[in-house]
Amino acid sequence: MKWTLAAVAAGCVASAALAQHGPIARARQVTASYTFDLVPSPDGRSAVLIRIVGGREQLFTMNMDGSGERQITREDADHEDPVWSPDGRRIAFVLVKDGRKVVTLINPDGTGAEAVTPANHSAIHPSFTPDGRAILYCTDDDLRPPEKNESEIYSIDLASKKVTTLISGGVNTFPVMSPDARKIAYRKIIGDMNSEVFVANADGSNPQNLTRHWTFEGWPAWSPDGKTIAYAGNRGNAGYQIFLMDADGGNPRLVAATEGRGTSPKWAPDGKTIFFTVCRESQERRGCDIMAAAL
């Protein structure tokens, strides 16, 4: 099926949750069902996304006009959290198979699969450093019942395979490094009913809570210029929506008003569009679609 990653018109929907400055984008659905987690390539010409095929999460690539869609994974396993290398030559993702989660690299055509993370780590949420030499990830070993109390953030050097612990203590997920490689944004879960977007130095020092809100907030994504962070939150009792804030946590504002659970914001390379996933009804991924909001 061919579809277009269309721009969206700006709306003027008021938000009681935040002091809103400027219009809120009225997001438009840009894919059919059974798709989620679209990530534009660094050159903005193509994208990788996840589609449900035969009950499994498989990776596809395509041109940004929706043409040339191609399935690049076929293993009887789930393939999650895709992300492009900065040079666009590799795609990292999480291979979920036989109870293990391994960050894996492949070429954009699906060849050259290479496991990256060590066997003793159940690894999730990979992201590349801006120079492409390392991958950040976190572990979910202790996120399963009955523990649910520990998730550390690591970096792994792709040449030496040296693993460095960056952030520990509590549940820390979704790490992503700023374009200037000086900061790491991530989600930290605080208690049973709260998570926040934090930023720390690149070595994990000096963590700062940017969102400071009693609800759930997470899925941070740096803008290409590093001045803004997109994130998802459920402020205002309206389900998860997509927000922006300045890189220091100031000026939080709702950017996309949607029906359903909006998460996983991803920036277009030109910084003019945010793609994200919206799941409806049961919140199962079979009910998920990819949306776009023009800024």
Q: For each of these PLM feature ranges, what is it?
A:
Residues 19-295:
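Sequence signature of WD/YWTD-type beta-propeller architectures
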